[in-house]
């Protein structure tokens, strides 16, 4: 930020050096800069950023250390007993062992354990540098995701499969982003209930001739295909109302992880999720169907499936989560999923613009991957037996992502349909 001769703030000039480069410069010149985190206290400190080579000389283990805030050229060999970074040492050897096993498998051997060599060849050392830098980028990405999330659930990121880093040009959002030609009108009226569960006829679902969707524990009890009407910002009831579930956001800790079977990124839960519990929303940019057709032609060439029609009553709008989205962007398809989609209405009652919520179809164990069916359908017998009004039918379900190209399914379940669409 520049200042003019009168001390007033002037134009903003983009810095030509990165933050780490400026930190390195400060340390080289022995200059303190509070804005860069370089103070007198840590000016001469040495912090290990990562380990990127290893050798064993006689009986002494030595590690080539990249020091934080210093260029690669100033990396030094250090004996193990000088290093206090136990987690980095453990991760270094874990990465090394995994890569050695991968190479052994590629060579056709069936080793289940490998011995660390006395010296690493150049390709191994190069791999460990790339892996260390990737971990740094993924940590930074996880920090960015958690800084942007407005929900309770924490997000972790993990890649123990390859060297893929954070996706480019992906922006984390917590609610729909309204695109050109789309207008969302917020509701101006709400229920007057003091206890929304005691008055079946007067609360928000009853006003639209529908049953309450949740039980007292916030678990969905209506069948897939029926809409969910939650209490809104104009309702008299408070935030503890049992009819406020989706609007409270994600409550669970999740991990975005790299799959080992070619399905890209996936999402696993780090907590047990009970059957019929709300898990997450599918959010993205709301665009017109015409714009979706245009973008779809581009996505066809990329093999992506982030376009999700909002055709609860008519196909007018589409959610595009390719660039703007939340953690649902990374949820994979399965022909036998553990998530089910519901249309939800809260502060906007336009039936062309429902919110899309995922609920657990069964109890989901800690560490289990979350999936939904990209080509979801409902049993017509179930629809007919639980029919609530003459307008309900198969078309009442939220659509799957746009069915544009024939994509091979890799879900691996016994009932796999072989193709997504």
Swiss-Prot record:
Zn(2+) 2 binds at residues 191, 204, 231, 235. It holds the Pfam family Chromo. It is found in: Nucleus; Chromosome, Centromere. Signal peptide: none annotated. Histone methyltransferase that specifically trimethylates 'Lys-9' of histone H3 using monomethylated H3 'Lys-9' as substrate. H3 'Lys-9' trimethylation represents a specific tag for epigenetic transcriptional repression by recruiting HP1 (CBX1, CBX3 and/or CBX5) proteins to methylated histones. Mainly functions in heterochromatin regions, thereby playing a central role in the establishment of constitutive heterochromatin at pericentric and telomere regions. H3 'Lys-9' trimethylation is also required to direct DNA methylation at pericentric repeats. GO terms for biological process: cell differentiation; methylation. Residues 189-249 form the Pre-SET domain. It comes from the Eukaryota. It is an enzyme of class 2 (transferase). Zn(2+) 1 binds at residues 191, 193, 196, 203-204. Belongs to the class V-like SAM-binding methyltransferase superfamily. Histone-lysine methyltransferase family. Suvar3-9 subfamily. This is Histone-lysine N-methyltransferase SUV39H1. Zn(2+) 3 binds at residues 196, 231, 237, 241. It comes from Xenopus laevis. InterPro entries: Chromo-like_dom_sf, Chromo/chromo_shadow_dom, Chromo_domain, H3-K9_MeTrfase_SUV39H1/2-like, H3K9_Histone-Lys_N-MTase, Post-SET_dom, Pre-SET_dom, SET_dom. Zn(2+) 4 binds at residues 335, 409, 411, 416. Its EC number is 2.1.1.355. Residues 405-421 form the Post-SET domain.
């Amino acid at each position: 930020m520049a200042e003019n001769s009168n001390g007033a703030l002037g134009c903003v000039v983009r810095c030509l050096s990165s933050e780490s480069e400026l930190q390195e410069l400060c340390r080289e010149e022995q200059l303190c800069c509070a804005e860069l985190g370089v103070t007198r206290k840590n000016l001469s400190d040495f912090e290990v950023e990562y380990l990127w080579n290893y050798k064993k000389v006689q009986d002494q283990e030595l590690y080539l250390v990249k020091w934080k805030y210093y260029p690669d050229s100033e990396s030094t060999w250090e004996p193990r007993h000088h290093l206090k970074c136990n987690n980095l040492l453990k991760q270094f050897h874990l990465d090394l062992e995994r890569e050695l096993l991968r190479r052994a498998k590629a060579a056709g051997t069936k080793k289940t354990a490998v011995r660390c060599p006395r010296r690493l060849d150049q390709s191994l050392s190069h791999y460990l540098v790339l892996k260390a830098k990737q971990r740094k980028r993924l940590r930074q990405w996880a920090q960015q995701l958690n800084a942007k999330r407005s929900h309770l659930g924490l997000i972790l990121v993990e890649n123990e499969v390859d060297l893929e880093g954070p996706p480019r040009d992906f922006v984390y959002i917590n609610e729909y982003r309204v695109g050109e030609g789309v207008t969302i009108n917020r509701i101006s009226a709400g229920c007057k209930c003091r206890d929304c569960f005691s008055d079946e006829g007067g609360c928000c679902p009853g006003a639209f001739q529908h049953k309450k969707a949740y039980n007292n524990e916030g678990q969905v009890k209506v069948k897939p295909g029926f809409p969910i009407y939650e209490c809104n910002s104009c309702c008299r009831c408070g935030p503890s109302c049992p009819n406020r579930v989706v609007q409270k956001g994600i409550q669970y800790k999740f991990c975005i992880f790299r799959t080992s079977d070619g399905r890209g990124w996936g999402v696993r839960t780090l907590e047990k999720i009970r059957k019929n519990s709300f898990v997450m929303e599918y959010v993205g940019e709301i665009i017109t169907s015409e714009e979706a057709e245009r973008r779809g032609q581009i996505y066809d060439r990329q093999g992506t499936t982030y376009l999700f029609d909002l055709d609860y009553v008519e196909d007018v709008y589409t959610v595009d989560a390719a660039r703007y989205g939340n953690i649902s962007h990374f949820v994979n398809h399965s022909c036998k999923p553990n998530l089910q989609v519901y249309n939800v209405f809260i502060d906007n009652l336009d039936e062309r613009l429902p919110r899309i919520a995922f609920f657990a179809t069964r109890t989901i164990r800690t560490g289990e991957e979350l999936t939904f069916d990209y080509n979801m359908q409902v049993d017509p017998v179930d629809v007919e037996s639980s029919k609530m009004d003459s307008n309900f039918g198969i078309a009442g379900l939220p659509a799957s992502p746009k069915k544009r190209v024939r994509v091979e399914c890799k879900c691996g379940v016994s009932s796999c349909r072989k193709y997504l669409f």
